[in-house]
Design a protein with these regions (language model features):
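Gram-negative outer-membrane beta-barrel domains
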Residues: 2-7, 16-278
Length: 278
């Protein structure tokens, strides 16, 4: 289901719940602590142009080509922004997976007139999956995949309260443990990786809440989240295995490192929120 469809459904539901809320007193207060949660859809940004980059000389720059003994590009067939379904680009690739996101949260708001400001702490899980595949002329495939194990966020909130509803903007820091994996059809070389990564990033967006009762609110929230994996890149190192010394991965320095070209793991999140207020 597309983000626009989720947004429309959520907005319609919120409007339905908001009708009785708007009939409440204009003096409805939002100040105080709250606990709650959210559930929604996480959709990844378009990464069709992503590729795999290589370091054949060991300088850490990942700016080399993997060439055959005849100086031809061993990865001339190209790349795709997904998981391969065959050994050639023409076989196609599976689209990256969008999935559910669910979180628990706690926060505190302060109200001054119609202005409400505060903070929210949030933690949860995300079922999205992001892959990129490189195709070699052997032909073989090399697929790098990442998923979020869990994420934590600390965000500020600033909003405007009116007749039982709160409209707000939010933004702050985000942290995630990212699970990485590697698959290949190459059974000749050896492959080792540096495992999972822990990435910092940021998140921002906005939303609306309506009070259905004095101590209970329901809302709709959109967030754009970016985790930057650049400081803790997932790297796959290619070794000799049983390959000949003329193997393209081995010609320059006896081995090659590979990683994905885009270290940013970005997504759009839209979800329903609920909170118990004290």
């Amino acid at each position: 289901m597309k983000i626009s469809q989720i947004l429309l459904i959520g907005a319609s539901a919120l409007a339905t719940f908001a009708t009785p809320a708007f009939a409440q007193s204009e003096d409805e207060q939002w100040e105080g602590a709250y606990i709650g949660g959210s559930i929604g859809l996480s959709a990844q940004s378009n990464d069709r142009n992503e590729s795999v980059v290589f370091d054949t000389d060991g300088d850490g720059a990942f700016d080399n080509s993997v060439n055959t003994i005849l100086a031809a590009d061993a990865f001339a067939p190209g790349f795709c922004g997904g998981a391969s379904t065959g050994t050639a680009p023409t076989d196609g690739c599976l689209s990256d997976k969008d999935g559910l996101e669910y979180n628990i949260r706690a926060g505190f708001d302060v109200q001054s007139g119609n202005i409400v400001y505060g903070f929210v702490l949030e933690g949860g899980m995300n079922e999205s999956r992001d892959s990129v595949t490189a195709f070699s002329d052997t032909p073989d495939t090399y697929t790098l995949t990442r998923e979020i194990d869990y994420s934590l966020q600390a965000r500020a909130r600033l909003g405007y309260a009116a007749r039982g509803a709160l409209f707000y903007a939010t933004g702050g820091a985000a942290y995630a443990k990212i699970n990485n994996s590697f698959t290949t059809t190459n059974g000749v070389n050896s492959f080792t990786d540096n495992g999972n990564s822990k990435s910092w990033g940021y998140s921002y967006g906005g939303g609306a809440e309506v009070k259905l009762a004095k101590n209970f609110s329901l809302g709709l929230e959109y967030l754009y989240t970016n985790f930057d994996d650049d400081d803790d890149d997932y790297v796959v190192s290619v070794g000799p295995g049983t390959a000949a010394v003329t193997d393209p991965f081995l010609i320059v320095s006896g081995g090659t490192d590979m990683r994905r070209s885009d270290s940013d793991f970005t997504m759009h999140n839209i979800g329903l929120t609920a909170a118990i207020r004290f």
